[in-house]
């Protein structure tokens, strides 16, 4: 909250667009890592007790563009949330990457994905167990309906440029 106040306090016109679990067809992100691991391994252990919502760079770009289009015409909230629709665990996303990747011919056979706990996969940064963002008011303000994360994931994988 202090960071929000610091950002908004430095300008007469400021806007923060919060997002989470960003995936896209290029760069390093969870979806492309899972696609690579589905190709390389027979089995994967993926955290199943952290829930959020993947957000495609493709739909995030639409939200950013729409924000810029209407920012001068409309009174937008200073802090908005954007994510694709639905909820998923990292495990759910990994399974979906395998299924969709196989459907699209990006992998031959998906790896078997085993659910594990956060305790089974320690990381330097502590991750929240539940990190969903409510994008309802942002969707209304931007007049965008958004997309379910599985449909957005399909779009990401269709455009993926992985070796």
Feature annotation, model-predicted:
Residues 148-163:
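Amphipathic terminal alpha-helices
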Residues 119-144, 153:
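A hydrophobic C-terminal alpha-helical subdomain
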Residues 52-55, 88, 133, 144-147:
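Residue-level signal for the nucleotide or nucleotide-sugar donor/cofactor binding architecture
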Residues 1, 30-31, 57, 61, ...:
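A general structural signal for well-ordered alpha-helical segments in protein cores
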Residues 46-51, 78-87, 141:
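Glycine-rich Rossmann NAD(P)(H)-binding loop
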Residues 63, 70-124:
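Mid/C-terminal beta-alpha module of Rossmann-like enzyme folds, strongest
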Residues 5-52, 57-59, 65-66:
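NAD(P)-dependent short-chain dehydrogenase/reductase
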Residues 58-69, 150, 154:
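Amphipathic alpha-helical segments that line or abut small-molecule/effector binding pockets
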């Amino acid at each position: 909250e202090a960071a929000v106040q610091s950002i908004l306090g430095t300008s007469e016109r400021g806007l923060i667009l919060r997002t989470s679990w960003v995936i896209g067809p290029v760069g390093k992100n969870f979806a492309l890592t899972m696609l690579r691991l589905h190709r390389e391994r027979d089995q994967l252990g993926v955290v199943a007790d952290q829930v959020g919502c993947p957000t495609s760079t493709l739909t995030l770009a639409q939200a950013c563009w729409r924000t810029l289009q209407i920012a001068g015409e409309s009174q937008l909230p200073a802090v908005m949330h954007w994510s694709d629709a639905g909820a998923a665990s990292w495990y759910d996303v990994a399974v979906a990457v395998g299924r969709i990747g196989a459907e699209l011919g990006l992998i031959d056979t998906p790896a078997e994905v085993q659910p594990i706990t956060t305790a089974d996969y320690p990381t330097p940064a502590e991750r929240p167990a539940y990190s969903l963002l409510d994008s309802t008011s942002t969707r209304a303000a931007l007049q965008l309906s958004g997309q379910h994360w599985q449909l957005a994931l399909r779009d990401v994988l269709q455009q993926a440029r992985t070796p």
